[in-house]
Amino acid sequence: ECRWFWGGCNNDADCCKHLECKRKWPHICLWDGTFT
């Protein structure tokens, strides 16, 4: 189950599609800039 926007994460794989794990604190899922 993937993490949604602003969800806590350890790496990009934790986040849902089009989201990436922020490299610096707080480690949350943010939009990665993609649409497809």
From Swiss-Prot:
It comes from the Eukaryota. It comes from Pterinochilus murinus. Keywords: Calcium channel impairing toxin, Disulfide bond, Ion channel impairing toxin, Knottin, Neurotoxin, Secreted, Toxin, Voltage-gated calcium channel impairing toxin, Voltage-gated sodium channel impairing toxin. The record marks W4, K22, K24, W31 as: Important for interaction with Nav1.7/SCN9A. GO terms for molecular function: calcium channel regulator activity; ion channel inhibitor activity; sodium channel regulator activity; toxin activity. Coiled coil: none annotated. The presence of a 'disulfide through disulfide knot' structurally defines this protein as a knottin. The keyword Secreted applies. This is Mu/omega-theraphotoxin-Pmu1a. Expressed by the venom gland. Disulfide bonds join C2-C16, C9-C21, C15-C29. It is found in: Secreted. GO terms for cellular component: extracellular region. Gating-modifier toxin that targets both voltage-gated sodium and calcium channels, with described activities on human Nav1.7/SCN9A (IC(50)=5.5-7 nM), hNav1.6/SCN10A (IC(50)=9.9 nM), hNav1.4/SCN4A (IC(50)=62.9 nM), hCav3.2/CACNA1H (IC(50)=955.4 nM or 63.5% inhibition at 10 uM), hCav3.1/CACNA1G (95.1% inhibition at 10 uM), hCav3.3/CACNA1I (90.8% inhibition at 10 uM). Acts on Cav3 currents mainly by inducing a strong depolarizing shift in the current-voltage curve. Belongs to the neurotoxin 10 (Hwtx-1) family. SUPFAM superfamilies: omega toxin-like. The keyword Secreted applies. InterPro entries: Huwentoxin-1.
